[in-house]
């Protein structure tokens, strides 16, 4: 009897150990790709491994929440830390897609104002602006109203395939001042106005879904004008491309690091986020890539600011801050309407 119990206990222990081993995996960080992630891999992900011994892998997505929601509902979470835009973060925090962050592990005091929310720690500031190739077009549109003038400025235009930023741009093109955009867009009449404005140039629109595409489209001549990520445009300009940074067309926000609800690596993920938002690794990253960090000591560093002409914080006063509150409230309905409109 004793031997049988001993054998049974050993089998249970072995089974538990095997299950634990099956559940154990490397940390998985998922971001938006591009030059930032290439350099984050070296300085943040691999830096964490060097400092703490935990292996970190990374992958890329385009911001779609459906996959994250599905893995949470299925309780089969294969992503641990994700870079998320602000409205999606807040909605995901409210509906249980993301974990509340542990501020005993993550030092909340190191961030700029607005750099943290319950489920997110600020990663980087980002923005989009209008640009074009001055080697092909010496004098292009300087604002969104001019971008809508297809007679004066013929050619294809490229926008990100999303209602966020696209609807704001449409209203500004239609004459709505920056400071009134969200007041107007919060009304049915304002939403109709934005889609009507888009109707006027729909035949000239080429949509992009990854951050590299607008640069590729403009470089190849497939489109004449594009609204693309500031960091990528500034980087291309620094490497010799004749792309102007038209700051009066700036729309900007923060991306955040979040932990997927149900991650088996939740505790380690909190430590990773704290590391990735520390000044030292971010300053090292800034040596290789122009960043707009949400960590105050880095954002305020004169050398970082001088090295990054595309730092959105330097130009926020002339741009439009993308309203997280607006997109949390109206985003789901406008996404459905936008997708239906684009498919027609």
Regions found by a protein language model. Give the residues of each.
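Conserved C-terminal helix/tail region of periplasmic/extracytoplasmic solute-binding proteins
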Residues: 316-344
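Mature extracytoplasmic/periplasmic domains
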Residues: 260-319
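A bilobed periplasmic-binding-protein/Venus flytrap-type ligand-binding module shared by bacterial periplasmic
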Residues: 129-136, 171-173, 254-268, 284, ...
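Extracytoplasmic ligand-binding site segments that recognize negatively charged/polar headgroups
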Residues: 34-41, 78-79, 84-216
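Paired acidic/hydrophobic, glycine-rich loop segments that form the ligand-binding mouth/hinge
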Residues: 76-83, 207-208, 224-229, 244
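Periplasmic-binding protein-like
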Residues: 108-111, 126-128, 191-192, 196-200, ...
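Early extracytoplasmic/lumenal segment of secretory-pathway proteins
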Residues: 23-92
